[in-house]
Amino acid sequence: XSGKVLSEEEKAAANVYIKKME
């Protein structure tokens, strides 16, 4: 992102990161 809207790729990356933190 550019800081405006999260792309699908960025959403997926964030989802993976969150799952790793659990």
UniProtKB/Swiss-Prot annotation:
It is found in: Mitochondrion inner membrane. Its EC number is 7.1.1.2. It is an enzyme of class 7 (translocase). GO terms for molecular function: NADH dehydrogenase (ubiquinone) activity. One of its GO terms (cellular component) is mitochondrial inner membrane. Keywords: Membrane, Mitochondrion, Mitochondrion inner membrane, NAD, Oxidoreductase, Translocase, Ubiquinone. It catalyses: a ubiquinone + NADH + 5 H(+)(in) = a ubiquinol + NAD(+) + 4 H(+)(out). It is a peripheral membrane protein. Complex I is composed of about 45 different subunits. Transfer of electrons from NADH to the respiratory chain. The immediate electron acceptor for the enzyme is believed to be ubiquinone. This is NADH-ubiquinone oxidoreductase 16 kDa subunit. It comes from Solanum tuberosum (Potato).
